[in-house]
Structures are given as C-alpha cells and as structure tokens.
Amino acid sequence: MTPEDPEETQPLLGPPGGSAPRGRRVFLAAFAAALGPLSFGFALGYSSPAIPSLQRAAPPAPRLDDAAASWFGAVVTLGAAAGGVLGGWLVDRAGRKLSLLLCSVPFVAGFAVITAAQDVWMLLGGRLLTGLACGVASLVAPVYISEIAYPAVRGLLGSCVQLMVVVGILLAYLAGWVLEWRWLAVLGCVPPSLMLLLMCFMPETPRFLLTQHRRQEAMAALRFLWGSEQGWEDPPIGAEQSFHLALLRQPGIYKPFIIGVSLMAFQQLSGVNAVMFYAETIFEEAKFKDSSLASVVVGVIQVLFTAVAALIMDRAGRRLLLVLSGVVMVFSTSAFGAYFKLTQGGPGNSSHVAISAPVSAQPVDASVGLAWLAVGSMCLFIAGFAVGWGPIPWLLMSEIFPLHVKGVATGICVLTNWLMAFLVTKEFSSLMEVLRPYGAFWLASAFCIFSVLFTLFCVPETKGKTLEQITAHFEGR
C-alpha cells in the first residue's frame, strides 16, 4: 500500500444517512469487551492485598519473603509484555473477537493456579499467566472498541478501557479487606468468565470483516451494533496485506508509530508508579489511623477522574486533556520533590527513602503538615493522570494506526508500555539512591514537561474523526 492509493483513506463505515447512529448495542458490545480491562485491573490490584496475607501465611500454605514478594508484583509486567506481542499477532490473524475470547483462558487459568498454589513457584506461575492475559487484553480491547464505535462516542467508549482497569484495581483493594488471598483469586475468575460468556453473543468488528472480504457478516454486524447498514464502503485496497519493514518509510505508518510508542513511554516515565509506591507511607506520615486506606483513596480518585475523562473526552478532545493532565502532573511531582527535599534534604540523611521517620530537625507538627503537602500532591497527581495520561495513550493507540499494520504496531506499543513499567518499577529504588528521592521526582516532573511539549507539537486531534480520516491526516491528504 502506498500513500498514493486513495482507497486507503475512504471511510469504511460512515454514519448512517449522514447523521449519528442510534444503535445501543454498541454500548453492550463495548461493555463485554471492557470486561477484559476489568480483569486486567483486578490482576494488577490483586498483589496489594494478597502480598501481606501471603507474607504472614503459615505452613503448609506458600509464604512469600521480601524477594519473592517483589517478583510476585513485577512478574505480571513481564507476562504482559509477552502478551502484547502475542496480542499483536492474534488480533490480525484470529480477529478481534476471538482474541478477546482466547485471552479469558489465561486469566481464569492463572487465578485458578494461584488458588490451588502449594508453593511460591505456583504463585509466580499463576501471576505470569494472568500477566500474559493482561497484555493481550490491554491491546485487543481498545482495538475492538475503537472499531465498533462511531466517531461521536469513540472517545467515551475508548476511555472506558482505562475506567474499567481502575475499577478492577479498586475492586481488588475493597475485596482484599474481607477475602484472604485464595478466595480473592477465586473472585478474579469472575470477570473473565463473564467476558467469555458475553463475547460469544457479540459480533466481530465490521472493519475486520471487511478486510477479510466477509461482506454479509460485516453488514449483519453493522446492523447489530449501529442499527443500520447505511454509510458503508468496500474495504480499502491493501488493508489485508501483512506488515513489512519497508512500510516504515511511509508517513502514514512511521508518524503514528512514533506517536504511539512515545505516548506509552511518557505514560510510564510520568512517575505514576513512584507515587503509588509511596502512597501508604505518606498516609502514615499524615497520621491516618489505617494506612491501608491509602490504597482505597487512590483507587476512588482514579475511578472518579477517569469517569470524568470518559464523559468529556468527545467534547474536550484528546490533545487538550493530555496537555492539562501533563501540566497538573508537572506541578504535583514538583511539589512531591519539594516535600522530600524539606524532610530529607539534609546531608546526613540516607538517600534511600526511609520517609517513615521525619527529619530530627523537624517538629512533629511541622512533619505532619508537610505530610499533608505530600497527600495533597499525591491526590492531585492521581487526578491529573486519570484525566489524561491514564486513558488517552490507550485510546490513541487504537485510533491512529491503519488497519493493515494495526496488529504489529499496537503490539509494539503495548510491549513498550509494559517493558517500561517493569524497568521503572524495578529500578526506581536504584534511581533514588543516585538522585535522592526529591531528585527522582523532579526528574519525573521534567519528563512530564517533555510530554506536554510532545503533545503540543506532535499529537494530532482525533476527536470526531473516522479512523480513515485519521489515517488520511498522517498521509498528508
């Protein structure tokens, strides 16, 4: 396919009769697909309540030491990186629907292995399986939803991917208060099982069916989702061709590729994992009686502001929310760094984060007051992240790539995201030893500044455009 082929940019699926579709089943199909991200969020949140329980476990139950606990949390990201590659292969060969059905299997199998675990290796194996499923779901669900949605609601439905992730995390936190780790793993089997059931009754995306020359099935899917088959075009010439490196010379390919990979990298370099790492300790410093409340507070803020983002996404647009989100994160990470500078800035202090003890020169009341600065900065950061840099990179990833490279390109984006998440999580402590905690957060603030500049100069607005119009923009048409 070359940029000179006009058929590539013709709309596959336009609004029926020139007006917005009125089909409601598209919301049901999006909900069914979004149960994958809900399962993904539950798997991410599972480690927070499960690790303390597993560290206290008495024989014959498996027990985690500090090293095993670290891997129990981190191995999911490695599995997800592999899942991103697998998902990129599956989504173009098996289709979007079948890929979602298949990813429910390692979700259920992984949680089942954890439930039956008799040793640490079974626990890690179960987490690796759920991580693999997370990687597939994080790629396929946004692609499926973006391809079934009409432009007027694509931002809303696409943002629901991240909304369901944070709902899943919050669900794991709340359930962890009343369920021990085995029963919590049993609960983790419910969302993917429900997804498997519902997706059996949902259609494949019309765009994928068109590229496979399955016209009648595409028309039936369109009627099911949108309530109409009007506004339909033949599949673009070349949309079924496979990816090869020579395509990277085309602006319609390399421009969205650079944007997609950069967005995923900036998301992880924003400092979000560092803020989450410190949440409970900061709440302890602010004299909260139950520091585990921090996880729930963080989860509630994420859900509320991701929901706000979903509601305003198709009005405010992607670029504006990314810029506002980045600016909020710049100020909040800078304030975080100032907190650490004030409490640990003395030359005699360890550079390795023991923030649970205030600096001796600080009175207790002053220490508590500074801790409230950190609590406010943390809540502001989480709200800012949830409004923009949480959901939008995943949404844009599903929008900006042409059909014939979508599987490979989104797979590389997901691989980038999960590898960056693993590296940032595992190496953050080492970074703080070199730069001190305040330096690490100020570095995150600098990355947030770069993310704002990158958005302003490189990221186009996709609000209200068809996927084919977005492709035409990158090709300079």
From Swiss-Prot:
Regions that span the bilayer: 26-46, 71-91, 97-117, 128-148, 157-177, 183-203, 257-277, 293-313, 320-340, 368-388, 405-425, 439-459
Pfam families: Sugar_tr
Gene Ontology molecular-function annotations: D-glucose binding; D-glucose transmembrane transporter activity; dehydroascorbic acid transmembrane transporter activity; fructose transmembrane transporter activity
Induction: In testis, down-regulated by estrogen.
Record-linked PROSITE patterns: MFS, SUGAR_TRANSPORT_1, SUGAR_TRANSPORT_2
Keyword Transport: yes
Membership in a protein family: Belongs to the major facilitator superfamily. Sugar transporter (TC 2.A.1.1) family. Glucose transporter subfamily.
GO biological process: carbohydrate metabolic process; D-glucose transmembrane transport; dehydroascorbic acid transport; fructose transmembrane transport; hexose transmembrane transport; insulin receptor signaling pathway; male meiosis I; response to hypoxia
Localization per Swiss-Prot or TrEMBL: Cell membrane; Cytoplasmic vesicle membrane
Topology Extracellular: residue spans: 47-70, 118-127, 178-182, 278-292, 341-367, 426-438
Glycosylation sites: 349
Protein name (record): Solute carrier family 2, facilitated glucose transporter member 8
Residues annotated as binding D-glucose: 162, 267-268, 273, 394
Assembly and interaction partners: Interacts with AP2B1.
Membrane recorded as keyword: yes
Ways its activity is controlled: Inhibited by cytochalasin B.
Function: Insulin-regulated facilitative hexose transporter that mediates the transport of glucose and fructose. Facilitates hepatic influx of dietary trehalose, which in turn inhibits glucose and fructose influx triggering a starvation signal and hepatic autophagy through activation of AMPK and ULK1. Also able to mediate the transport of dehydroascorbate.
Cytoplasmic side: 1-25, 92-96, 149-156, 204-256, 314-319, 389-404, 460-477
Chief subcellular location: membrane
Membrane topology, as annotated: Multi-pass membrane protein
Recorded catalytic activity of this chain's protein: D-glucose(out) = D-glucose(in); D-fructose(out) = D-fructose(in); L-dehydroascorbate(out) = L-dehydroascorbate(in); alpha,alpha-trehalose(in) = alpha,alpha-trehalose(out)
InterPro entries: MFS_dom, MFS_sugar_transport-like, MFS_trans_sf, MFS_Trehalose_Transporter, Sugar/inositol_transpt, Sugar_transporter_CS
